Amino acid sequence: MKMNRHFTVPQNGESSTIQWTKRNSKITNPDGSKVFEANDILVPEDWSQVAVDILAQKYFRRKGVPKYLKKVQEDGIPEWLQKSIPDTEKLESLKPEDRFGGETSALEVFHRLAGCWTYWGYKYKYFSDEESAKIFYDEIVYMLATQMAAPNSPQWFNTGLNWAYGIDGKSQGHYYVDPSTGKLVKSTSAYEHPQPHACFIQSVDDDLVNEGGIMDLWVREARLFKYGSGTGTNFSNLRGENEPLSGGGKSSGLMSFLKIGDRAAGAIKSGGTTRRAAKMVCLDVDHPDIENFIDWKVTEEKKVASLVTGSMLNNRHLNAIMSACYEMEGEDRFNPKKNSSLKKTIQDAKKVLIPDNYIKRVIDLARQGYKEILFEELTTDWQSDAYNTVSGQNSNNSIRLTNEFMAAVEQDQPWNLYFRTEKEKAKVEGRKAKPSQTLRARELWEKISYAAWASADPGTQYHTTINEWHTCPEDGPINASNPCSEYMFLDNTACNLASANLQKFVNLETLNFDVEGFRYLCKLWTIILEISVTMAQFPSKEIAELSYKFRTLGLGYANLGSVLMVLGIPYDSQQAMAITGAISSIMHMTAYATSAEMAKEQGPFVGYAKNQKHMLRVIRNHRRAAYNAPSGDYEGLTITPIGINPAFCPSYMLKAAQEDADLALSLGEKYGFRNAQVTVIAPTGTIGLVMDCDTTGIEPDFTLVKFKKLAGGGYFKIINQSVPYGLKKLGYSPSEIEAIVNYCKGHATLNGAPVINTQALKEKGFTNEILEKVEASLPLAFDINFAFNKFNLGENFLTKNLGISKEIFDSPGFSLLEHLGFTKEDINKANDYVCGTMTIENAPFLKEKDYPVFDCANKCGKYGKRFLSYESHIRIMAAAQPFISGAISKTINLPEEAVIEDIKNAYFLSWKMMIKANALYRDGSKLSQPLNSVLELLNGIEIDDQEEIREATISKDPVQIAEKIVTKYISHRRKLPSRRAGYTQKAIVGGHKVYLRTGEYEDGQIGEIFIDMHKEGAAFRSLMNAFAISVSLGLQHGVPLEEYVDAFTFFKFEPNGIVSGNKHIKMSTSVIDYIFRELAITYLGRYDLGQVAPEDLRGDEIGSKRATAESNGQEKETLSSMTAVIEPTPKKEVETISYSQMISKEKPSSSPSGISLLEEVKLAKIKGYTGDSCSECGSFEMVRNGSCLKCMSCGSTTGCS
């Protein structure tokens, strides 16, 4: 093919000018610890820091890149395009550790990708001459550097490693079809033929151990996950539970095998180190195990709730029983008939159904001298052991719904389920299969809807619609999809994806869409994806053969939501639907026209001749949708697609869409097509951030105000850049736009603020120097109070200038502005002016009729009420679907208050509007997700242990109760020896020195504590001294240390934050929290309350279970001699505890930043995030991305995009 330049001009053999700069990349946890760091990396100057971080952290090759390279001569390949290998002679001059390293420049990555594609394209005659190859290379580098487009993640991971650096490895069992001979070949190298495909669909036979069977599928899946890809399978071939086996007996059923695959997937991280494995499990709606499949995740979520609750109850009650065994002397203490305290704790345990054998076990352990039970408390964090224990957490689940089933639901008809063997036998014998069970279709529909409402799964795939648009039905039906549901084709095929950044094609002066530029990009990236099929290797023989035979591609786009906002068009409008259809048609039909051009030179795909009439029928239907043809004109469709409505589409876009449709059909009729499919709409998770997209895939924006990451660290609040352009398009003046933008993001200054402004603060005693400090912090502040804290203003100013004592401004909940006499209403007004409302609703000058242009997926800010309905999402999907070969990956967000009827309506509307697949996510439908309404309902409602004891011991004889309490806590005070052992621990908590001293009994148990903070104020020091005496008296009267630990850990007040001087504890929420963490670690072995485990401090042993706790110069009993482990030694809690995990502990909690749990989650939600924490960097900047989550800080996803 002859290539022409469009974006570049020749310049000394390089692509057109791109400004480059050196940046540092650092991703940290909330506590400041490093996740990743790279310095002086070369990147395009206009890339955001987030894009730089993701490229450096995820897509740079970290090792194996030689410092010196040399070219490998190859006949017919120009020197600039030849492969490179390590130059061993030059490398020998370097120290061994300096010979290889990692990539340090974005240009290296772009060269690796573009060079590899160009090499394979030139080698197999995709270009008419060397000049065309050079143009192709330059244009691709330019598009990557300017963020116009990006390939899927496996391309970034794998493509070009062998071509650019000579990196190789042992073959992993892959296959490829030799393009020269067309013969299947087993790979001998891991990287010579890369694995660039992200999406796979695999089949599974009803066979346990043979090739193509169940256990073989897990091996094939593992091979895919290792190289960063995702896979989907329809498991309907597997027999249902109790279905007869050929050799006698009954089948264990589909679900038993799905649980094996789920476990295998959970053990593998995709791409080696970056993401969890991603997989899709599909099941036909007539499978005999369909009900169990629908309920799978609902049931497993219930198990998580049970595990979490049960672990906490067991821990509390079993340790209470253990403690009761030490409240008196002699053998009678183990007899509940003679030890009233033991009897009471056993009764309490039995009330909450603690197993009898565990109660007996604890008493037996107490007889043997054990004094504590280590029973791990599980949490609802999605990465916790509770979720790791249950099944179904490593796949997206979808049900294949036929038109027959949907009609049965509509008409309230019965629905038959069939044993697999019976269905197959009936097909062979040419008769109607006998059902194994008959249900009401609506009952099954109710189950599907409830499960999606309760657990966000299953999604739906509309089997009949999918197959009516199938280009190759002669080779079998489409049975499944990839994990994100955008790739839908034959079993044992693969698709590699790429997405265009639509925002780059909007002229920000004229606000017109650059049709020619977009067409050019679509053409080049169709060629790239086709070349990628030629160079690829695959995880099995079948996939290699069928992917070569059908050559499916997955070109798509991102940033549609931003484009619509820039053009001043509401996402939920007829105009948006028409423009979406036009853009999709231009992309889709340009890709097919390019495919036909390649077919002219390379020949059509192998399976084309057999399927020619079907494929041309599908292309004609695509063209009819571009012309908005009436329903009677379509061929072979039961549901009429949504065509491009000419009344709402700009004429130039409509003309282009129809021209491209005409061209694709005419070229296809003449030459055939090189590819069976060409387009999908992927979620563009990580690659969307690399392209600095505001919105991913076909999604709308999630918020109007963003927090831009700064190169030097920190964040800067900005308005979504689509907003000013959208306002301009709507006719607002520059001054009106400025006012609206400032209303949203804030003025970032006190000048002009209502009530709390520069003048008012000067009258309160603020100096010009201090006001400058406040002003400098306002652009970074999310709330005005953050600018008025002691760290920003300085303690000296607060005490000397404002006359506020340290005791006052150090007190919990202290607000300087309120202390100065400003009301909460004053503060809110000033906060809205300075920091913004984060919503456009009620903005000055903005007409209410223009509100819909700026509607987002979620409510914006704390005042926002508007958000896009589920119907609007479905309508946009319906507008794009007629111009997409595959499907659209999208999860529709529903608010927490959505009801099951909404789920039913959304899934039903999706079918009626000819969407191929859909998934819904109701806010809070996962137990692991923090939810505002739950937090607000339960905030402040904590369990008072003493009140609980009082209520539990209530009876008709109050005098008797009083006697028991006196007997228990007063009559048996245990005196400490006059000379006692103990230890002194010095630490600094939040910048304040703390000395903790302990006193011990002869047996090593703690009996007293002393707390010294001698530089603090007299009142605070005296309170701490009184507190220490109170605790000491309690310890001497038999109050177990663990009770204090449970009561006071996670207690929050200042000083708090970073802890230095303690080898196990690095972060605390208060001095009291620190003290009881330290005591728990030393005397109870509770290393889960520290951030550094003992094994992290030992260099020569791994996880010794008999680790010795050390005292001040005195060795204590080994842990195992006084602590019983009911379960294996508890897994240490990670330093960054998720919000759901913190809630589950039923203690006042805070984030490492010191902000309360409720406030932190509220802030995340107000900013438009979900409230979940990122598993990679710990930030709370997670947004929903297709059916997964994506971190806006580091780019990690919980799926395959």
Curated annotation (Swiss-Prot):
Alphabetized InterPro entries for the sequence: RdRp_reductase_class-2, RNR_2_N, RNR_lg_C, RNR_NrdJ/NrdZ, TSCPD_dom, YebC-like
Higher taxonomy: Bacteria, Pseudomonadati, Spirochaetota, Spirochaetia, Leptospirales
Originating gene:
nrdJ
Biological process GO terms, please? DNA biosynthetic process
Q: What cofactors does the UniProt entry give for this protein?
A: adenosylcob(III)alamin
Q: Which family does it belong to?
A: Belongs to the ribonucleoside diphosphate reductase class-2 family.
Q: Where is the composition biased (Basic and acidic residues)?
A: 1100-1118
- What domain of life is recorded for the organism? Bacteria
Q: Which GO terms describe its molecular function?
A: cobalamin binding; cobalt ion binding; nucleotide binding; ribonucleoside-diphosphate reductase activity, thioredoxin disulfide as acceptor
Which stretches does the entry tag as region Disordered?
1100-1120
Q: What EC number(s) does its UniProt record assign?
A: 1.17.4.1
Q: Which UniProt keywords apply?
A: Cobalamin, Cobalt, Disulfide bond, DNA synthesis, Nucleotide-binding, Oxidoreductase
Cysteines joined through disulfide linkages: C199-C495
The UniProt annotation places substrate binding at S153, A198, C199, G230, N482, P483, C484, S485, E486, P683, T684, G685, T686, I687
* Catalytic center residues: N482 (proton acceptor), C484 (cysteine radical intermediate), E486 (proton acceptor)
- What is known about what this protein does? Catalyzes the reduction of ribonucleotides to deoxyribonucleotides. May function to provide a pool of deoxyribonucleotide precursors for DNA repair during oxygen limitation and/or for immediate growth after restoration of oxygen.
The protein's name in its UniProt record: Vitamin B12-dependent ribonucleotide reductase
The record lists the organism as Leptospira interrogans serogroup Icterohaemorrhagiae serovar Lai (strain 56601)
The record's catalysed reaction(s) read:
a 2'-deoxyribonucleoside 5'-diphosphate + [thioredoxin]-disulfide + H2O = a ribonucleoside 5'-diphosphate + [thioredoxin]-dithiol
Entry cofactor note text? 5'-deoxyadenosylcobalamine (coenzyme B12).
